[in-house]
Amino acid sequence: MASPGTPGTRMTTTVSINISTPSFYNPQKKFAPVVAPKPKVNPFKTGGTSESSQPQPPGTGAQRAQIGRVGEIPVSVTAEELPLPPPPPPGEELSFSSNCAFPPPPPPFEEPFPPAPDEAFPSPPPPPPPMFDEGPALQIPPGSTGSVEKPLAPKAHVEISSAPRDPTPPFPSKFTPKPSGTLSSKPPGLDSTPAPAPWAAPQQRKEPLASVPPPPSLPSQPTAKFTPPPVASSPGSKPGATVPMAPSNSTRYPTSLQTQFTAPSPSGPLSRPQPPNFTYAQQWERPQVQEKPVPTEKSAAVKDMRRPTADPPKGNSPLTMKEVEELELLTQKLMKDMDHPPPVEAATSELCGFCRKPLSRTQPAVRALDCLFHVECFTCFKCEKQLQGQQFYNVDEKPFCEDCYAGTLEKCSVCKQTITDRMLKATGNSYHPQCFTCVMCHTPLEGASFIVDQANQPHCVDDYHRKYAPRCSVCSEPIMPEPGKDETVRVVALEKNFHMKCYKCEDCGRPLSIEADENGCFPLDGHVLCMKCHTVRAKTAC
C-alpha cells in the first residue's frame, strides 16, 4: 500500500487506470478475488482541502470519490505539483487483500449515471504486449517508455466537472490484478505507474464496458470495421467534460483504443451496476458474445451465394399439362414405330436356309444349323411343327422335333426299346450298354472281347470256346487259348485234334515235333508213333 504522504500518487493512479482500460480485456491475465483495503488518506486531499482521510459512506461524498470519465481529476492539481511515487512492493496487493471481507451491497442509486461516450469501441483483438505496470494501471503505448514524465503530460489540463454528480458508491474492489508475466526493465525506483486507488476498482467492476470518448482536438481517427450503436446517455451527466491531451500522446491514445476494442458496448437507456462478484473473466467474455453479428453476416453471404443453386430445382417440380401432352405424343409415336416397323430390304447374303428368300433386318429370324431361317420356315422336317424356342435334333442337317426324332432312333436288339441315350453297335445290331452281355454268363461285354456264334449271339471268349472249341483226342478237353493269349494253338494229325502237350508217341510217350523230320510223327495203322516205335511195330507185323 502506498504511503499516506503522497496524495499525488493516488491522483496519478486514477488517471492511469482510466487510460489503460483496454488492459482489462487481456484474456491471458488471471486475477485473484481480492478486496482493496480502505484508504487512510483522501486521494483528492491537497494542502487547502479539509476533507476527512477516511472513505465516506455511500452518498454525495462517495460520489465525489468516484471517477466516471477518463482523466477527471481536481482542477487545482496539475502535473507539475505531483512528484513521482515510489513503486509498490511486489505482492503487496495480494497479501493484504486476501484477509479482507466483502462489504455489504450498496444502496440504490439516487442519481443517474454520467453520459455515455459519443462512440463505442469494438471488442479487443488478441492481447497486447505486456507493459511495465504490475496491475490494471496505465499501459504505456509503444514509443512512450523512454521518459518518466511522458505519462503525466496529458494530466495537466484536465477538468473534473462531472465527478461530483457520479452516483456510483465507492465500495471496495473485489479483484486486484496480478502483476503481468513480463517485468519491466526499469529499476523499481523509476516506475511511474503506482498501485490503483481503492475507489477505481468499483468503477471498473460496475462499468466494465464503459468506453472513453475521443478528444475533440484529435484529427481524423481510423474507423473500425464494425461500429455498434452508442450507449444511451444518462440525463444527469454533463456532456461538456472533455480531457485535452498533450500533442505527444494525442495520436497514440486513440490508436491504442481503436486497435484494442472491436466489440460494441452494451446499449440501453441506463447503465445498470454489476454485482460485486463480476470478474474480469466475465468482462472479457462479453465482447466475444457480441462478436456474433460478424459470422452471421458471413453465413448470410454464404446463403446468398448458395441461393442460385437452390432456386432452380425445377426438375423436381410437377410437370405442366403441356409437358405431359408432349410426353404422351412421344410415347404413342414410339409404340407405333415398334408395332409397324418400316420395311428394310435385306442384303443378298442373308437368305433363309429353307425357302432361300431374303431376310429383313426388322423381322424376327431364327439362327440354327449355321443358317438363318424365317420363323415360319424353321419347322420339323417330318411333322412340320414350328421349332422356334423348342428343342430340336439334327439328323443329317435336318431339324426334327423330339417325337419325330425318337421315331428315327435305333431299337435295342435285346429289349426292343428305343435307344435315346448311349448306344452300342455290334454284329449289325444296336444295343443298350447294359443289354449287350454274354448269352451264357450274362457278363457285360462293353469294352471286352466277344465272339458271336452262328445265331449272331454274343459270347465271351471263355464261354464260346467251352461251347464251340474242338476237343483234344487225348484228354477230351476243349482246345482253348492259353491264359493271357487270344490265339488258340492246336495240332491236327490223322484228322484228330491235339493239344501241344498231348501230341506224343502212343507207345513210348515221346513228344513229337510238328515238323516233318526224324522227330516227327510216323503214323502206323492210325496210331501216332515216333520213328523207333514205328520200326518196331512194323517188324513185328511182318
From Swiss-Prot:
Residues 22-319 are annotated as: Disordered. Residues 352-411, 412-471, 472-538 form the LIM zinc-binding domain. Keywords: Cell adhesion, Cell junction, Cytoplasm, Cytoskeleton, LIM domain, Metal-binding, Nucleus, Repeat, Zinc. It is found in: Cytoplasm; Cytoplasm, Cytoskeleton; Cell junction, Focal adhesion; Nucleus. This is Zyxin. Residues 27-45 have a biased composition (Low complexity). The keyword Zinc applies. Residues 102-131 have a biased composition (Pro residues). Adhesion plaque protein. Binds alpha-actinin and the CRP protein. May be a component of a signal transduction pathway that mediates adhesion-stimulated changes in gene expression. Belongs to the zyxin/ajuba family. It comes from Gallus gallus (Chicken). GO terms for cellular component: cytoplasm; focal adhesion; nucleus; stress fiber. Its main location: cytoplasm. Residues 300-309 have a biased composition (Basic and acidic residues). One of its GO terms (molecular function) is metal ion binding. One of its GO terms (biological process) is transforming growth factor beta receptor signaling pathway. Pfam families: LIM. CDD domains: LIM1_Zyxin, LIM2_Zyxin, LIM3_Zyxin. Residues 247-265 have a biased composition (Polar residues). It comes from the Eukaryota.
